[in-house]
């Protein structure tokens, strides 16, 4: 079993969501033996990426789980084990999603904000980040990253690209882009338990 006294999981939400998402809440409910942290992700990737790397380091994350946009960020947390569910690797290409203007969060942030604004500069910052997605990869941190892909995801389809980078760490499941509790319960959570128990048994 896990030898560490406290195992920390950081969950990174998707676009338009916040650290108060139902997915983070469900993970905390079903994995009470772990410390589950669910930060609000800054809107601008130029701020978000360094913030998340520092956040994971400061909190000594054992595992980073991300969905959609959060999975794209999770993949870049190179120093940690990562689970990337339906990763939106190229947000700037999702022109029907990432639009200039002011938008409503699905649920308010942990500081009570209900809206966020996308500017042309933010979209350009996504493009800049995307041009360096794999710069920090090496053989060691590749093996610590897994991609989960829903067979009914009609929003993003970067499975083949992910497979080229992280073969053979790709797992397909029956489901769409947005996670539901059934997929969390039957697919993601069992893998989390298996991964953490296997990783720390010998420490």
Q: What does each model-identified segment do?
A:
Residues 3-4, 57-60, 140, 195:
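Glycine-rich phosphate-binding loop signature in dinucleotide/nucleotide-binding domains
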Residues 37-39, 73-85:
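Internal alpha/beta domain cores that form substrate/cofactor-binding pockets in large enzymes
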Residues 81-203:
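The alpha/beta-hydrolase serine catalytic core
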Residues 20, 24, 28, 74, ...:
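Short, highly selective alpha-helical patches that border small-molecule cofactor pockets
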Residues 62-65, 81-83:
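Residue in the alpha/beta-hydrolase core beta-strand immediately N-terminal to the catalytic nucleophile
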């Amino acid at each position: 079993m896990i030898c560490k006294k406290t195992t920390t999981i950081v969950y990174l939400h998707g676009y338009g969501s916040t650290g108060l998402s139902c997915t983070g809440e469900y993970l905390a409910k079903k994995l009470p033996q772990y410390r589950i942290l669910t930060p609000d992700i800054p809107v601008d990737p130029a701020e978000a990426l360094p913030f998340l790397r520092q956040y994971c380091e400061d909190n000594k994350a054992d595992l980073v789980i991300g969905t959609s946009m959060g999975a794209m960020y999770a993949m870049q947390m190179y120093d940690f084990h990562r689970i990337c569910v339906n990763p939106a690797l190229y947000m700037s290409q999702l022109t029907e999603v990432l639009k200039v203007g002011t938008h409503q969060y699905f649920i308010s942030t942990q500081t009570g904000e209900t809206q966020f604004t996308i500017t042309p500069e933010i979209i350009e910052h996504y493009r800049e980040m995307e041009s360096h997605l794999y710069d920090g990869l090496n053989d060691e941190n590749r093996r610590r990253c897994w991609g989960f892909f829903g067979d009914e995801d009609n929003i993003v389809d970067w499975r083949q690209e992910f497979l080229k980078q992280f073969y053979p760490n790709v797992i397909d499941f029956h489901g769409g882009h947005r996670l539901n509790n059934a997929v969390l319960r039957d697919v993601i959570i069992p893998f989390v338990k298996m991964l953490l128990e296997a990783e720390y048994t010998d420490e």
